[in-house]
Design a protein with these regions (language model features):
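Conformationally flexible catalytic loops at phosphate/diphosphate-handling active centers
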Residues: 162-255
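Short acidic, glycine/serine/threonine-rich loops at helix termini
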Residues: 36-39, 65-67, 88-92, 113-119, ...
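Thiamine diphosphate
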Residues: 1-126, 131-132, 148, 390-392
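Conserved thiamine diphosphate
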Residues: 118-162, 166-169, 345-359
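Peripheral docking tails and interdomain loops at the edges
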Residues: 320-393
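Redox- and metal-dependent alpha/beta enzyme cores, enriched for Fe-S-associated oxidoreductases
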Residues: 260-288, 301-308
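Glycine-/acidic-rich phosphate or pyrophosphate-binding loops and their flanking alpha/beta elements
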Residues: 8-13, 241-264, 277
């Protein structure tokens, strides 16, 4: 039986990591993820974990050390945000290309510049094509639950790829909520012991990691990565089913909130989904058929399942907390619209950029989004398909 506690998102993730008891945790602090290694360091000092905690001199080094540990056969992870992630950019691709199932606790923060320490998704969206699995949390409970499930997904023999567990900086990382924790023994049994398939410290099977790859081999290596990513959706669902049996909390590739009979829908990632649910409840009480599709698994992108979930809506607003600089749409908008196009959807669609640099998202803002969708339906015209919400003109 689990217990209820009042925790910030960062502390919840740190507790999940204590329960997992990884082998190696290299870390370098950066706001707003600093508290994760800070809390974890206290667990190390108090003898609550056996983890080799390595304070390093930079984020590039923290990911490099995690890669080295994982290549040697250890269960490894690190944590970072924003410019710290940018500093380890080169290493993100190294981890993925070497099929190392390490984890990154990413607390989403705007990339500079101008310099900003608040939330948006520009850091993780910039790395969306690096070969990492990406999962996002709406609230502190989901941040904890996703972290518990992370290694079960990344270490699966059909996957063997690194995973990012993302939550919104300050909005969830520092805000305190009541959440339900699992018992330590439950998490330990659920995650299990790491059994590396190929690793450097195996005298029975000598191998090289990350050798120079010439034209004859590079493309096959990339195809191999892509094949591993194709298995992720099924593994995520299988792990979620096992997690639900243990915890009673159900997860999928996304959450469809009051979407069954909706004629207007919002698609989004992260904490603003909670605000959107409040707006939906208010509008539903007034008889309006509105709903939400909240993305949990963003990479790989579950295009077919998302298109199927949206097949009956008349108008969709895809909300991006990151600018794409394409004159076409943000990252999520481009992916969702492509999925709808392939499914031959006739729904009107628009892409809305919102919340950059931590700008607040209010219930009234989301009510206006649904009102704009109704206008699109009434006029049978999507109008401006690349918009901004809450911006001063």
């Amino acid at each position: 039986m689990g217990k209820r506690d009042r925790l910030s998102g960062n502390e919840a993730v740190a507790i999940a990591l204590r329960q997992i008891n990884p082998d190696v945790f290299p870390a370098f602090p950066i706001t707003p993820s600093t508290e994760i290694p800070q809390y974890f360091a206290s667990f190390v000092a108090n003898g609550q974990v056996d983890t080799e905690f390595i304070p390093v001199e930079s984020e590039h080094s923290s990911m490099s050390a995690a890669i080295g540990a994982s290549a040697a056969g250890a269960r490894a992870l690190t944590a970072t945000s924003s410019c710290g992630m940018a500093y380890m950019w080169e290493e993100l691709y190294i981890a993925a290309s070497n099929r190392l199932p390490l984890a990154l606790a990413l607390v989403n923060r705007a990339l500079s510049g101008p310099i900003n320490i608040n939330c948006d998704h520009s850091d993780s969206m910039g790395a969306r094509d690096s070969g990492w699995i990406q999962m996002y949390a709406e609230n502190n409970q989901e941040a904890y639950d996703n972290m518990v499930q992370a290694f079960c997904i990344s270490e699966h023999r059909d996957v063997r790829l690194p995973i990012m567990i993302c939550q919104d900086g300050f909005i969830t990382s520092h805000a305190v909520e009541n959440i339900e924790l699992l018992e330590d023994a439950e998490v330990k049994g659920f995650v299990g012991e790491y059994e590396p398939e190929n690793y450097l410290l195996n005298p029975e099977c000598p191998m090289a990691v990350g050798p120079y790859s010439v034209t004859d081999f590079y493309m096959e290596a990339k195809r191999n990565q892509a094949e591993g990513m194709k298995h992720v959706e099924k593994v995520v669902l299988d792990v979620a089913k096992e997690f639900a049996e243990m915890s009673g909390r159900e997860y999928g590739l996304f959450e469809a909130y009051k979407l069954e009979d909706a004629d207007r829908a919002v698609v989004m990632i992260g904490s603003a989904a909670g605000t959107t649910k409040d707006a939906i409840d208010k509008l539903r009480a007034q008889g309006e058929k509105v709903g939400l599709l909240k993305i949990r698994l963003y990479r790989p992108f579950p295009a077919e399942a998302i298109a199927e979930a949206l097949k009956n809506v008349k108008a969709v607003a895809v909300m991006d907390r990151a600018e794409g600089y394409t004159n076409h749409g943000g990252p999520l908008g481009s992916d969702v619209m492509a999925a709808m196009f392939r499914a031959r959807s006739t729904a009107l669609a628009t892409n809305i950029i919102y919340g950059l640099g931590g700008r607040d998202v209010r219930v009234e803002d989301m009510e206006q989004v649904f009102a704009d969708l109704q206008t699109m339906i009434d006029n049978d015209d999507a109008g401006e398909t690349y918009r901004y919400m809450g911006i001063r003109e």
